[in-house]
Amino acid sequence: MWCLHCNSERTQSLLELELDSGVEGEAPSSETGTSLDSPSAYHQGPLVPGSSLSPDHYEHTSVGAYGLYAGPGPQQRTRRPRLQHSTSVLRKQAEEEAIKRSRSLSESYELSSDLQDKQVEMLERKYGGRLVTRHAARTIQTAFRQYQMNKNFERLRSSMSENRMSRRIVLSNMRMQFSFEGPEKVHSSYFEGKQVSVTNDGSQLGALVPSECGDLSDPALKSPAPSSDFADAITELEDAFSRQVKSLAESIDDALNCRSLHSEEVPASDTARARDTEPKPGLHGMDHRKLDEMTASYSDVTLYIDEEELSPPLPLSQAGDRPSSTESDLRLRSGGAAQDYWALAHKEDKADTDTSCRSTPSLERPEPRLRVEHLPLLTIEPPSDSSVELSDRSDRSSLKRQSAYERSLGGQQGSPKHGPHGGPPKGLPREEPELRPRPPRPLESHLAINGSANRQSKSESDYSDGDNDSINSTSNSNDTINCSSESSSRDSLREQTLSKQTYHKETRNSWDSPAFSNDVIRKRHYRIGLNLFNKKPEKGIQYLIERGFVPDTPVGVAHFLLQRKGLSRQMIGEFLGNRQKQFNRDVLDCVVDEMDFSAMELDEALRKFQAHIRVQGEAQKVERLIEAFSQRYCVCNPGVVRQFRNPDTIFILAFAIILLNTDMYSPNVKPERKMKLEDFVKNLRGVDDGEDIPRETLIGIYERIRKRELKTNEDHVSQVQKVEKLIVGKKPIGSLHHGLGCVLSLPHRRLVCYCRLFEVPDPNKPQKLGLHQREIFLFNDLLVVTKIFQKKKNSVTYSFRQSFSLYGMQVLLFENQYYPNGIRLTSAVPGADIKVLINFNAPNPQDRKKFTDDLRESVAEVQEMEKHRIESELEKQKGVVRPSMSQCSSLKKESGNGTLSRACLDDSYASGEGLKRSALSSSLRDLSEAGKRGRRSSAGSLESNVEFQPFQPPQPPVLCS
């Protein structure tokens, strides 16, 4: 449970963890505050004669036993208890400061998995054992989240005057040219391509939205007209909106095509400004006024304004000498948007700078930032009631947007990072690779039954990057990768590559280093990125962007989240629900833009949305996800929105549906306490600006939810949960390495393969054929050994035997007269003694080869992840630069088959030996014997709740591999 994973050094109670981390609206505890055991908190003001604590009162007080007062005054105190309580206050303050200090240190340093598991174990030991603590944590978490959801729902109901949904819909969807405000709030618009955005109180934000075309506002638009003048012309107003938007796409295309004919004639330094403000000599029949009108319309359409903040976009003056075409124009715009996310506010003052080549791997940027047109290009939805027309336009817009962003990434993937400012490389020929929108490739499932595995060679292209499905992640295909060559300057690229460890899409023949030509390494890095995402989404996205697996634009990340397998849908929701980071909010907007909710009931549209994104967790994140969904639903169904007085009603109703689904299908809610139809209707009374939602609508929603739960589609965690249910029987609890007592299914854990082997207690003694049969479940970080417990016609159950962490594991082969297909697993953690974990014998050589290949690759993946974690911490705390690709090439050569030699591991960890040992606290080193460098063998994982049973095999025979 998340509430048990506390990184503080001082263990705390579960209630402390919950209250300190999650309770909203509660003032944080003051460091100078009084203690809980100090009665009446002591009057902290100056003592006056009239005060109950004035010295006059002390003359009449008598001290009783233990310093308690015996006088008549209930508020009178003696001096001695005051000193005692003051000492208690100071002690409490010191403890609180220690807790805060340890929390700040733990947040800045990422502990290894075994240290995190050790912290959880210590909490469990302190508060009554594993079962008691986990049950308490689960109860607290469920109750607190339900309380927060209910409180947020009541807050949203009571604050309808805020009109947050109306404001966001009008501002962020100006491309619709359609206002959901009432007749009394609609103001004049300049229909010839210009638009006036209106706030909730009727005041104008500006006569024209600031855009690239400069200030084209009309003085007549500065003052709003009386609302009575427009109350009689609403129909005409909406018709004008519709006509304008229907012709908007064609006007934009014509304008772009005409501008692209003579884009080379405009000086590079003035390209962006001239494109929007100056007429071109070859516009053939298009006068200046019409061009300005269409330019203003185009700017209004593509500009995204959030929370009523209007800021001018960054000047796009880095046009360069690129081919004059519509594609170049799109690249310029999308490149500027990408630059806004990844640049650290550096100004480019050179004409030959290509903004689309910038790819700084930081997912965060300073808060004082300018908001530019970072929403997808050409996302135009007309306000037509026809769902067919809207769906068709939405699909075409999505294709245009995807193509534009993929073109803008051509230079980014082929150019490595440059210097501290991430400046683009100079002197590189700008070649446009042919990137086509490609539907997601169906991924093969890989479940090796009895050691057999079905593999298929995969040829990767674009951003597929050896993506694995939820079961198989170790397809070791060495086929040639179809990559696009971004530059012909190999020497400059290789020189830049040495300064930053990353992946660049180059043809196989253009690299001399075998690390780049090894498809196994490439796929391993991709899986590591998935694992990091499933642990910490922001860190995983940054890792994948750094290595070129994911475009560094909101649209590219949105496509990755929707199309790729191996991502936890729970973590997708965590990433998209993050309100603190602008990039996450933009990715969420792009994700919902890819979904079409036209002609769908609200609950069915919400079902489609939740199928891709798990809507649960903290109430604030759930609110953010539902808000984005409601916005998109209003865009896709303007006819439905007209039925309500306020678009906020859609948001409130969607939030109520989530509460209904949680209440109806939560196992913690008793059947007699589940929400009834009348309760559901009662909760939604008066939410539509004082009016009730039609009862028939609410009844239909309630019945559909009652018949069918809102569920999230299966991911790789679903299969791990199925395996967890199959493992039954006694699971010993109480030792350091627990059994499968509670949780095996975690967001980052996926099933690699399953096979049948035979355990060998003594390799020097024969045993009967088929004796000690074991069913092996190999996960990406754990090896679980089970035995068949019961067989039925349609199901098999397994009893748990042993489990081993893959970190520090070595896979060896042995053969003798008794066991021709022997497999030996040893612990090879640096600095620790080599320990034989277990011996197996495979039924045949083919099964042995397939199992050992998968196991070695999984071990190498775990080793690489731990190495990446240590390097990241060294960079963060000590400023140590990661080793270059050339320095790591020898290590990666050895780890290509999944086996790292003992000396290689020692060398990799000895690089930071000059630093403090605390800086490399990557393990339970401090808990092992004194004088030993390295970490002791963590033969089980607390995180997976697996029992480790000590096994002492006899002396191993001579290995012959």
UniProtKB/Swiss-Prot annotation:
UniProt keyword Coiled coil, yes or no: yes
Residue stretches of biased makeup (Low complexity): 469-487
Residue numbers carrying Phosphotyrosine: 909
Gene Ontology terms describing biological process: dendritic spine development; positive regulation of focal adhesion disassembly; positive regulation of keratinocyte migration; postsynaptic modulation of chemical synaptic transmission; regulation of ARF protein signal transduction; regulation of postsynaptic neurotransmitter receptor internalization
Disruption phenotype: Mice with a conditional knockout in cortical neurons exhibit an increased density of dendritic spines with an immature morphology.
Tissue specificity of this protein: Expressed in hippocampus.
InterPro entries: IQSEC_PH (IPR033742), PH-like_dom_sf (IPR011993), Sec7_C_sf (IPR023394), Sec7_dom (IPR000904), Sec7_dom_sf (IPR035999)
Reported function: Guanine nucleotide exchange factor for ARF1 and ARF6. Guanine nucleotide exchange factor activity is enhanced by lipid binding. Accelerates GTP binding by ARFs of all three classes. Guanine nucleotide exchange protein for ARF6, mediating internalization of beta-1 integrin. Involved in neuronal development. In neurons, plays a role in the control of vesicle formation by endocytoc cargo. Upon long term depression, interacts with GRIA2 and mediates the activation of ARF6 to internalize synaptic AMPAR receptors.
Family in the record: Belongs to the BRAG family.
Identification of the protein by name: IQ motif and SEC7 domain-containing protein 1
Organism: Mus musculus (Mouse)
